Protein backbone atom coordinates (compact mmCIF):
# COMPACT_ATOMS: atom_id res chain seq x y z
CA UNK A 1 0.00 0.00 0.00
CA UNK A 2 2.91 2.40 0.73
CA UNK A 3 4.83 1.63 -2.40
CA UNK A 4 2.99 3.84 -4.84
CA UNK A 5 3.08 6.79 -2.35
CA UNK A 6 6.81 6.56 -1.88
CA UNK A 7 7.39 6.58 -5.61
CA UNK A 8 5.21 9.64 -5.97
CA UNK A 9 7.19 11.60 -3.31
CA UNK A 10 10.48 10.69 -4.93
CA UNK A 11 9.19 11.95 -8.24
CA UNK A 12 8.20 15.30 -6.73
CA UNK A 13 11.62 15.67 -5.10
CA UNK A 14 13.36 15.04 -8.41
CA UNK A 15 11.18 17.62 -10.14
CA UNK A 16 11.88 20.24 -7.41
CA UNK A 17 15.61 19.60 -7.60
CA UNK A 18 15.54 20.01 -11.36
CA UNK A 19 13.61 23.30 -11.03
CA UNK A 20 16.10 24.75 -8.54
CA UNK A 21 19.02 23.75 -10.79
CA UNK A 22 17.47 25.51 -13.75
CA UNK A 23 16.82 28.72 -11.73
CA UNK A 24 20.39 28.84 -10.42
CA UNK A 25 21.78 28.43 -13.89
CA UNK A 26 19.66 31.35 -15.13
CA UNK A 27 20.83 33.59 -12.25
CA UNK A 28 24.48 32.99 -13.17
CA UNK A 29 23.81 34.02 -16.73
CA UNK A 30 22.10 37.34 -15.67
CA UNK A 31 24.89 38.64 -13.25
CA UNK A 32 27.55 40.50 -15.37
CA UNK A 33 31.18 39.79 -14.87
CA UNK A 34 33.21 42.88 -13.84
CA UNK A 35 35.92 43.78 -16.31
CA UNK A 36 39.29 45.35 -15.53
CA UNK A 37 37.95 48.95 -15.81
CA UNK A 38 35.19 48.25 -13.31
CA UNK A 39 37.69 46.78 -10.87
CA UNK A 40 39.92 49.87 -11.13
CA UNK A 41 36.94 52.20 -10.57
CA UNK A 42 35.89 50.20 -7.54
CA UNK A 43 39.37 50.31 -6.05
CA UNK A 44 39.56 54.09 -6.60
CA UNK A 45 36.21 54.56 -4.89
CA UNK A 46 37.44 52.54 -1.91
CA UNK A 47 40.55 54.73 -1.71
CA UNK A 48 38.51 57.98 -1.81
CA UNK A 49 36.31 57.13 1.16
CA UNK A 50 37.87 54.24 3.11
CA UNK A 51 36.15 55.25 6.31
CA UNK A 52 32.69 55.11 4.78
CA UNK A 53 33.42 51.75 3.13
CA UNK A 54 34.76 50.20 6.32
CA UNK A 55 32.31 51.77 8.73
CA UNK A 56 30.18 48.84 9.97
CA UNK A 57 29.08 50.46 13.25
CA UNK A 58 26.97 53.11 11.47
CA UNK A 59 23.27 52.20 11.59
CA UNK A 60 20.53 52.88 9.04
CA UNK A 61 18.70 55.08 11.57
CA UNK A 62 21.76 57.33 11.95
CA UNK A 63 22.06 57.55 8.16
CA UNK A 64 18.48 58.72 8.02
CA UNK A 65 19.03 61.36 10.71
CA UNK A 66 22.13 62.65 8.93
CA UNK A 67 20.21 62.91 5.69
CA UNK A 68 17.38 64.80 7.36
CA UNK A 69 19.77 67.26 9.00
CA UNK A 70 21.57 67.87 5.72
CA UNK A 71 25.07 67.52 7.19
CA UNK A 72 27.68 67.62 4.48
CA UNK A 73 30.70 66.82 6.68
CA UNK A 74 30.86 63.98 9.15
CA UNK A 75 32.60 64.22 12.53
CA UNK A 76 34.87 61.51 13.86
CA UNK A 77 36.18 60.76 17.30
CA UNK A 78 39.84 60.29 18.21
CA UNK A 79 39.64 56.65 17.08
CA UNK A 80 38.40 57.57 13.62
CA UNK A 81 34.88 56.37 14.26
CA UNK A 82 32.13 58.41 12.67
CA UNK A 83 29.82 60.06 15.20
CA UNK A 84 26.06 60.28 15.10
CA UNK A 85 24.25 63.50 14.26
CA UNK A 86 23.05 64.19 17.80
CA UNK A 87 26.41 63.56 19.38
CA UNK A 88 28.16 65.52 16.67
CA UNK A 89 25.77 68.44 17.23
CA UNK A 90 26.43 68.37 20.98
CA UNK A 91 30.16 68.38 20.42
CA UNK A 92 29.82 71.23 17.95
CA UNK A 93 27.71 73.31 20.38
CA UNK A 94 30.22 72.60 23.14
CA UNK A 95 33.04 73.78 20.91
CA UNK A 96 31.12 76.93 20.02
CA UNK A 97 30.51 77.68 23.72
CA UNK A 98 34.17 77.19 24.46
CA UNK A 99 35.14 79.53 21.64
CA UNK A 100 32.64 82.18 22.80
CA UNK A 101 33.92 81.93 26.37
CA UNK A 102 37.48 82.41 25.15
CA UNK A 103 36.46 85.46 23.11
CA UNK A 104 34.60 86.95 26.08
CA UNK A 105 37.58 86.30 28.35
CA UNK A 106 39.91 88.00 25.87
CA UNK A 107 37.52 90.97 25.58
CA UNK A 108 37.38 91.32 29.38
CA UNK A 109 41.15 91.15 29.60
CA UNK A 110 41.55 93.82 26.92
CA UNK A 111 38.98 96.02 28.70
CA UNK A 112 40.90 95.64 31.98
CA UNK A 113 44.18 96.53 30.27
CA UNK A 114 42.58 99.57 28.64
CA UNK A 115 41.05 100.69 31.95
CA UNK A 116 44.40 100.26 33.69
CA UNK A 117 46.14 102.29 30.99
CA UNK A 118 43.55 105.08 31.23
CA UNK A 119 43.90 105.09 35.03
CA UNK A 120 47.67 105.43 34.77
CA UNK A 121 47.34 108.27 32.26
CA UNK A 122 44.82 110.03 34.53
CA UNK A 123 47.17 109.74 37.50
CA UNK A 124 50.03 111.16 35.43
CA UNK A 125 47.88 114.11 34.34
CA UNK A 126 46.78 114.79 37.92
CA UNK A 127 50.39 114.61 39.11
CA UNK A 128 51.49 117.08 36.41
CA UNK A 129 48.62 119.44 37.23
CA UNK A 130 49.43 119.23 40.95
CA UNK A 131 53.09 120.00 40.22
CA UNK A 132 52.13 122.96 38.03
CA UNK A 133 49.81 124.26 40.74
CA UNK A 134 52.55 123.85 43.35
CA UNK A 135 54.99 125.79 41.19
CA UNK A 136 52.44 128.56 40.61
CA UNK A 137 51.78 128.83 44.34
CA UNK A 138 55.51 128.91 45.04
CA UNK A 139 55.97 131.67 42.46
CA UNK A 140 53.11 133.69 43.94
CA UNK A 141 54.55 133.24 47.41
CA UNK A 142 57.95 134.46 46.20
CA UNK A 143 56.30 137.50 44.63
CA UNK A 144 54.34 138.24 47.82
CA UNK A 145 57.49 137.86 49.89
CA UNK A 146 59.39 140.18 47.55
CA UNK A 147 56.57 142.73 47.83
CA UNK A 148 56.59 142.50 51.63
CA UNK A 149 60.35 142.91 51.66
CA UNK A 150 60.10 145.94 49.40
CA UNK A 151 57.44 147.53 51.60
CA UNK A 152 59.54 146.83 54.67
CA UNK A 153 62.57 148.45 53.10
CA UNK A 154 60.52 151.48 52.12
CA UNK A 155 59.12 151.73 55.61
CA UNK A 156 62.58 151.49 57.16
CA UNK A 157 63.77 154.15 54.76
CA UNK A 158 60.91 156.40 55.77
CA UNK A 159 61.51 155.80 59.44
CA UNK A 160 65.20 156.53 59.19
CA UNK A 161 64.55 159.97 57.68
CA UNK A 162 62.51 161.27 60.59
CA UNK A 163 64.61 162.52 63.44
CA UNK A 164 63.94 164.37 66.65
CA UNK A 165 65.66 167.70 66.99
CA UNK A 166 67.08 166.85 70.42
CA UNK A 167 68.43 163.34 69.89
CA UNK A 168 68.78 163.33 66.11
CA UNK A 169 66.45 160.33 65.58
CA UNK A 170 62.83 159.38 66.05
CA UNK A 171 61.93 156.38 68.13
CA UNK A 172 58.95 154.89 66.27
CA UNK A 173 57.19 152.33 68.39
CA UNK A 174 54.49 151.40 65.95
CA UNK A 175 54.04 151.34 62.21
CA UNK A 176 50.79 153.26 62.54
CA UNK A 177 52.63 156.20 64.07
CA UNK A 178 55.16 156.32 61.22
CA UNK A 179 52.45 155.96 58.61
CA UNK A 180 50.44 158.73 60.22
CA UNK A 181 53.47 161.00 60.18
CA UNK A 182 54.08 160.21 56.52
CA UNK A 183 50.47 160.95 55.60
CA UNK A 184 50.75 164.25 57.47
CA UNK A 185 53.90 165.05 55.50
CA UNK A 186 52.16 164.41 52.15
CA UNK A 187 48.95 166.20 53.10
CA UNK A 188 50.81 169.28 54.23
CA UNK A 189 52.66 169.59 50.90
CA UNK A 190 49.43 169.18 48.93
CA UNK A 191 47.54 171.74 50.99
CA UNK A 192 50.44 174.21 51.10
CA UNK A 193 50.85 173.92 47.29
CA UNK A 194 54.15 175.85 47.37
CA UNK A 195 56.46 175.15 50.29
CA UNK A 196 59.96 176.17 51.20
CA UNK A 197 62.05 173.00 51.62
CA UNK A 198 64.00 174.37 54.58
CA UNK A 199 60.78 175.29 56.40
CA UNK A 200 59.31 171.86 55.65
CA UNK A 201 62.42 170.10 56.95
CA UNK A 202 62.54 172.21 60.08
CA UNK A 203 58.89 171.59 60.91
CA UNK A 204 59.12 167.79 60.60
CA UNK A 205 62.52 167.59 62.27
CA UNK A 206 64.32 166.47 59.12
CA UNK A 207 67.47 167.49 57.39
CA UNK A 208 66.92 169.41 54.16
CA UNK A 209 68.65 166.74 52.07
CA UNK A 210 66.56 164.01 53.73
CA UNK A 211 63.44 166.03 52.93
CA UNK A 212 64.43 166.26 49.25
CA UNK A 213 65.11 162.51 49.10
CA UNK A 214 61.80 161.82 50.84
CA UNK A 215 59.92 163.92 48.26
CA UNK A 216 61.72 162.17 45.39
CA UNK A 217 60.76 158.78 46.81
CA UNK A 218 57.13 159.84 47.19
CA UNK A 219 57.16 161.05 43.57
CA UNK A 220 58.51 157.66 42.46
CA UNK A 221 55.68 155.97 44.34
CA UNK A 222 53.15 158.26 42.66
CA UNK A 223 52.00 159.93 45.86
CA UNK A 224 53.36 163.34 44.90
CA UNK A 225 53.84 165.20 41.62
CA UNK A 226 55.68 168.49 41.41
CA UNK A 227 58.90 170.36 40.74
CA UNK A 228 61.57 172.24 42.69
CA UNK A 229 62.61 175.70 41.56
CA UNK A 230 66.00 177.36 41.89
CA UNK A 231 64.90 179.20 45.03
CA UNK A 232 64.50 176.01 47.06
CA UNK A 233 60.74 175.86 46.83
CA UNK A 234 58.75 172.72 46.03
CA UNK A 235 55.63 173.31 43.89
CA UNK A 236 52.98 170.60 44.10
CA UNK A 237 51.06 169.95 40.84
CA UNK A 238 47.65 168.31 41.13
CA UNK A 239 46.19 165.82 38.67
CA UNK A 240 43.73 168.45 37.41
CA UNK A 241 46.59 170.80 36.60
CA UNK A 242 48.50 168.06 34.82
CA UNK A 243 45.40 167.32 32.77
CA UNK A 244 45.16 170.99 31.78
CA UNK A 245 48.80 171.00 30.69
CA UNK A 246 48.23 167.88 28.55
CA UNK A 247 45.17 169.43 26.93
CA UNK A 248 47.10 172.66 26.24
CA UNK A 249 49.89 170.75 24.52
CA UNK A 250 47.42 168.69 22.47
CA UNK A 251 45.61 171.84 21.33
CA UNK A 252 48.79 173.66 20.38
CA UNK A 253 50.51 170.66 18.83
CA UNK A 254 54.23 171.36 18.82
CA UNK A 255 55.21 173.72 21.62
CA UNK A 256 58.46 175.14 22.88
CA UNK A 257 59.66 175.16 26.46
CA UNK A 258 59.47 178.95 26.47
CA UNK A 259 55.81 178.88 25.47
CA UNK A 260 55.10 176.28 28.14
CA UNK A 261 56.82 178.41 30.78
CA UNK A 262 54.90 181.49 29.68
CA UNK A 263 51.60 179.67 30.14
CA UNK A 264 52.57 177.74 33.26
CA UNK A 265 51.32 180.49 35.58
CA UNK A 266 47.91 180.22 33.98
CA UNK A 267 47.84 176.40 33.92
CA UNK A 268 49.47 175.76 37.30
CA UNK A 269 48.75 177.71 40.44
CA UNK A 270 51.99 179.00 41.93
CA UNK A 271 50.48 180.83 44.86
CA UNK A 272 51.24 179.54 48.30
CA UNK A 273 48.21 178.58 50.34
CA UNK A 274 48.08 179.93 53.85
CA UNK A 275 48.12 176.69 55.80
CA UNK A 276 49.29 176.57 59.38
CA UNK A 277 51.82 173.96 60.30
CA UNK A 278 50.39 171.47 62.78
CA UNK A 279 51.55 172.53 66.19
CA UNK A 280 52.54 176.02 65.08
CA UNK A 281 51.50 178.83 67.33
CA UNK A 282 49.50 181.56 65.64
CA UNK A 283 51.34 184.80 65.00
CA UNK A 284 50.61 187.52 67.60
CA UNK A 285 48.11 190.12 66.48
CA UNK A 286 49.20 193.68 65.97
CA UNK A 287 48.33 195.80 69.03
CA UNK A 288 47.46 199.41 68.60
CA UNK A 289 49.40 201.22 71.33
CA UNK A 290 47.41 204.40 70.81
CA UNK A 291 44.91 204.86 73.55
CA UNK A 292 42.01 207.14 73.69
CA UNK A 293 41.38 209.37 76.53
Swiss-Prot record:
Residue intervals annotated with topology Cytoplasmic: 28-293
One Pfam family, short name: DDRGK
Places the protein is found: Endoplasmic reticulum membrane
UniProt main location, coarse: endoplasmic reticulum
Compositional bias annotation for Basic and acidic residues: 90-126, 133-151
Residues passing through the membrane, by range: 7-27
GO molecular function (one): ubiquitin-like protein ligase binding
UniProt-listed InterPro entries: DDRGK_dom-contain (IPR019153), DDRGK_domain-containing (IPR050899), WH-like_DNA-bd_sf (IPR036388), WH_DNA-bd_sf (IPR036390)
Domain of life: Eukaryota
UniProt xrefs under SMART domains: DDRGK (SM01128)
Record bears the keyword Transmembrane helix: yes
Keywords assigned by UniProt, alphabetized: Endoplasmic reticulum, Membrane, Transmembrane, Transmembrane helix, Ubl conjugation pathway
Region (Disordered): 30-151, 273-293
Residue intervals annotated with topology Lumenal: 1-6
GO cellular component: endoplasmic reticulum membrane
Membrane topology of the entry: Single-pass membrane protein
Record's function text: Substrate adapter for ufmylation, the covalent attachment of the ubiquitin-like modifier UFM1 to substrate proteins.
Family: Belongs to the DDRGK1 family.
Name of the featured protein: DDRGK domain-containing protein 1
Organism: Monosiga brevicollis
Amino acid sequence: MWGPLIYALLGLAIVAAAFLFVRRSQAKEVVPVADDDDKENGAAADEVNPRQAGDQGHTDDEDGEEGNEGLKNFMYDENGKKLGVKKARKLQEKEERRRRNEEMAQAREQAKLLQHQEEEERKEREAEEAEDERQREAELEREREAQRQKELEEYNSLKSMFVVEESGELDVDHEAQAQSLLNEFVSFIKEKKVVQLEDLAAHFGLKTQDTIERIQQLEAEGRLTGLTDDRGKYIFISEEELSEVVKFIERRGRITIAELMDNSNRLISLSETDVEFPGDEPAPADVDETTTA
